[in-house]
């Protein structure tokens, strides 16, 4: 997992596909977009623009992906995201791996939380369990952009 703020340069060299996704986040005015999918580089790099309401932690299931990494970016609002390493010990609640590249767990072993503010992003790789859209202080409307980057595009 990588955690940062879009206004701060990343001191590390990242794969081209991740840099392209971060450039999209840096240069797009998300107040001008409607919720939905935006293709950045076909199905290899695309963004989901989501308007959500944060919920209690127990109402959101932890998740992982295998074919895509997630770059979760908060355009406005506030949220907490649960994070953990996928130890292989989490009980599967629902597997939609073939249809949507997502596995939901009942719970997440050794979970910690990060706090997201507008401009924050978190990059989740296949080994990173994450539980997005959790209440930080109180229920809040958020706009979140999830950029999906195909693992096959990482160089």
PLM regions: where:
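Short beta-strand/loop turn elements enriched in aromatics
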Residues: 40-48, 80-96
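A short, N-terminal "cap"/entry segment at the start of jelly-roll beta-barrel domains
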Residues: 1-49, 61-64
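A short hydrophobic beta-strand segment most commonly corresponding to one strand
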Residues: 121-123, 139-155
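Short proline/glycine-enriched turn/loop segments at secondary-structure junctions
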Residues: 134-138
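A short beta-loop-beta micro-motif enriched in histidine and acidic residues
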Residues: 42, 58-70, 89-93, 109, ...
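Glycine- and acidic-residue-biased ligand/ion/polar-headgroup-sensing regions
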Residues: 67-69, 73-81, 88, 97-102
């Amino acid at each position: 997992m990588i955690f940062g703020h879009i206004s701060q340069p990343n001191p590390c060299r990242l794969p081209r596909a991740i840099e392209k996704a971060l450039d999209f986040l840096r240069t797009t005015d998300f107040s001008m977009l409607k919720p939905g999918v935006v293709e950045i580089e076909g199905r290899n790099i695309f963004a989901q623009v989501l308007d959500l309401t944060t919920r209690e932690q127990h109402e959101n299931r932890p998740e992982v992906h295998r074919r895509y990494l997630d770059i979760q970016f908060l355009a406005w609002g506030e949220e907490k995201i649960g994070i953990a390493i996928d130890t292989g010990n989490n009980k599967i609640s629902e597997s939609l791996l073939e249809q949507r590249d997502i596995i939901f767990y009942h719970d997440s072993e050794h979970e910690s939380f990060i706090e997201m503010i507008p401009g924050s992003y978190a990059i989740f790789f296949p080994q990173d369990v994450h539980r997005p859209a959790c209440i930080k202080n109180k229920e809040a409307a958020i706009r979140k952009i999830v950029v999906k980057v195909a693992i096959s595009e990482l160089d």
